[in-house]
């Protein structure tokens, strides 16, 4: 090999390495989706995001990803603390995520999309902690609402709307919840499943507000949907459970029990434990309306012991069990249920109910 040829090859290799290893070549955004958790790499332009989808330039080819399929987005300029916090949030380790986020000053973050993520995760984590372990719900709602109103084109928009609705319910502001769950919030999402989820959430909020006729209508709308996929069908089953509870609350507990027993008989607890938690809670409430405290206790106990993955349903079960154990002569068990409720779900509205 001649000296000139060798020199040319070396120069070419160095130039190639410089391109490959340069920050501009290495710095890429990554969209992680439900179908490709390894990530889709490219560059998201400043105007590449809406509440419904995110566009990314992948080697000259622009692809669009629906927001409801996105697990998370990692940006090229992410601070390491944000990378950790984002992963911790996905894993629902909110306390550790909060610790990481506390190290980041949003004012020092230059890229707007990264700054949006910092602001969102700071507010979202505080909201989740306020709803579960405790904290100032009003402050958490205020912080998240600032993000919600300032960044309506963020792909986090609908998640923020749902969480704000949950916070509103937790502080008894059902009027505010209606807005967050409604057409300007979660219910305005372009995906049918999100609309069903919004209707279900609104129905549950109306139950807590004592507006059982309105709640029943909300549940009927969801249950009567023509959507037919696994997620939609699951949401419709949950709506039927809500409808059954409304029957009990409006003087028809026998009808409610028949519907709920049918739900339990026809579904698999291994596939949807949360449905069974809601169903057994609703059965418990039906039995309470029939003045059958022992039957009610056994229903709520099933949620506590077998179907506790739905934190809201579990909190309700513990709240009802605390009273029922006392009423059935087991004050020690009542104290145990009350303590468990306060330790695990001090942020839940059920923890403050008398």
Give the predicted meaning of each segment:
Residues 75, 113-117, 155, 193-195, ...:
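Residue signature of alpha-solenoid helical repeat architecture, marking inter-repeat boundaries
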Residues 25-151, 155-166, 170, 188-189, ...:
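Compositionally biased alpha-helical segments
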Residues 298-305, 319-349:
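TPR/TPR-like (Sel1-like) alpha-helical repeat modules
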């Amino acid at each position: 090999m001649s000296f000139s040829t060798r020199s040319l090859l070396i120069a070419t290799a160095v130039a190639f390495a410089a391109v490959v290893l340069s920050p501009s070549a290495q710095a890429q955004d990554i969209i992680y989706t439900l179908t490709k958790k390894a990530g889709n790499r490219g560059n998201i332009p400043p105007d590449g995001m809406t509440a419904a989808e995110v566009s990314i330039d992948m080697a000259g080819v622009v692809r669009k990803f629906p927001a409801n399929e996105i697990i998370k987005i990692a940006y090229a300029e992410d601070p390491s603390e944000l990378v950790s916090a984002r992963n911790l949030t996905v894993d629902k380790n909110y306390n550790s995520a909060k610790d990481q986020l506390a190290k980041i000053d949003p004012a020092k973050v230059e890229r707007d999309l990264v700054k949006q993520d910092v602001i969102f995760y700071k507010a979202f984590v505080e909201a989740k902690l306020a709803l579960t372990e405790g904290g100032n719900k009003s402050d958490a709602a205020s912080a998240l609402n600032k993000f919600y109103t300032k960044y309506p084109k963020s792909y986090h928009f609908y998640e923020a709307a749902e969480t704000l609705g949950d916070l509103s319910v937790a502080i008894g502001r059902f009027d505010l919840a209606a807005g967050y769950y409604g057409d300007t919030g979660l219910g305005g999402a372009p995906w049918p499943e999100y609309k069903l989820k919004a209707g279900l959430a609104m129905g549950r909020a109306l139950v807590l507000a004592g507006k059982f006729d309105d709640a029943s209508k909300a549940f009927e709308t969801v249950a009567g949907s023509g959507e037919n996929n696994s997620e939609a069908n699951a949401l419709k089953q949950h709506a039927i459970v809500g409808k059954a509870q409304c029957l009990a609350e409006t003087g028809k507990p026998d009808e409610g029990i028949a519907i709920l027993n049918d739900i339990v008989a026809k579904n698999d607890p291994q596939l949807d434990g949360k449905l069974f938690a809601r169903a057994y809670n609703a059965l418990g409430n039906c039995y309470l309306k029939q003045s059958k405290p022992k039957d009610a206790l056994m229903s709520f106990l099933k949620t506590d012991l077998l179907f506790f993955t739905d934190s809201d349903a579990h909190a309700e079960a513990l709240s009802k069990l605390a009273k029922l154990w006392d009423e059935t002569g087991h004050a020690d068990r009542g104290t145990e249920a009350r303590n468990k409720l306060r330790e695990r779900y001090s942020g839940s509205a059920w923890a403050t109910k008398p």
